[in-house]
């Protein structure tokens, strides 16, 4: 089949070139955006009297037929068409004849793919944001049920201070909140229309780029045609934003793997989101969080891959940028299925509050409270209080106890400067609720955080 651009060529393209050069196997995913952009372009051409109203009507009707064929699975994608733009234009011309050949007036594939891909990226940005908001709802629902559920807060994966499970889950809600805000920022930054930039320097036709931007739902046209056709910042920003989302998912997934182990037993994953072993019949494996953890690596790779593609490209458009789409599409698909399955795995998991609270009785979680008591109530300098507390911990370990399990008499006998009332500050519940500073783990602060996060969510779920 003769190429639409083959006028100056004396030889046909080799079959090997067609296979190597074609992007149709993956950019056919842009069919909706391509047809949407072409409809807007046709309307603009008619408005500016570059084509007739009748020709515009024929083009719009033909594009609607092409859209129907694709969505019904009737459209025949031919590798010789190279890309989705040529495939749609070729079929349009088959359907409506000469009018179809006028659609590409005042347009290049350079600005055509720029607007198609940008619209795709912005749409996926919105979809991913919506999924994160749903995940946050699930996380906050869990947090609301466990405002007072004690668990060991950790640093260096060692027991540190008692916190509530609700407080711990709020931390993840805050991470995903930032992800949404990051995606919102990216969407706003890239919501500008490159269509009308043509190949690289604009067009001599009397086009109306403001009309195109409005018709396609953008804030305004882009400023510089050369930048417009060579820019892939919008794709890189989405890749980075997704990488951050997956990093946060991976951190939560890592904890789910730990929490579901026999050593922790903090949560039990449902059978629907667990797998078994081919040889060990007793096994119940946390494959979902393990895969979530592993999939973060592939989205990091997609980001680095496109950064590497873009780093040495001279202005303006280069064929190298054809390599932008597969990585973005893979990262989008990875993020969307990851967000969906994480939400369901969390919703269906059983929280073992008793195991969490029992774990708080190991690791001397209230040692800091004892040191603070010595400073505030016993007027002991902090460094000495730190030393005395270490002696109490050593005594408790010699007795095979946690410091929260020591009697007041035992503690008073370790150092004469320790005053009566010390036992009360070693209570795990009291320790948790004593941390009532803004952002702290007390029940009051955890409730306040949930309320703030819910208010933020409601503004975006309208």
From Swiss-Prot:
Keywords: Amino-acid biosynthesis, Arginine biosynthesis, Cytoplasm, Lyase. GO terms for molecular function: argininosuccinate lyase activity. GO terms for cellular component: cytosol. It is an enzyme of class 4 (lyase). One of its GO terms (biological process) is arginine biosynthetic process via ornithine. Pathway: Amino-acid biosynthesis; L-arginine biosynthesis; L-arginine from L-ornithine and carbamoyl phosphate: step 3/3. Belongs to the lyase 1 family. Argininosuccinate lyase subfamily. This is Argininosuccinate lyase. It comes from Wolinella succinogenes (strain ATCC 29543 / DSM 1740 / CCUG 13145 / JCM 31913 / LMG 7466 / NCTC 11488 / FDC 602W) (Vibrio succinogenes).
